[in-house]
Amino acid sequence: MNREYLEAKVDLCLNQAEIDIQQEEIARAIKNLERANSALSRIFNLEEEENE
């Protein structure tokens, strides 16, 4: 996966989590936050590989 895709996924998941929280869909919000976290981890792994 490329960096641009992962950054877009982070933004989308964070935005959806915010909507879920406003609608009191806490379980869905948590799942979207987990997805955002996963994408962020992949971004940082890409950066580490580039710096090696």
What are these regions (language model features)?
Residues 6-52:
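Short, charge-rich amphipathic interface segments used for partner binding and complex assembly
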Residues 1-5:
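A ubiquitous short alpha-helical element
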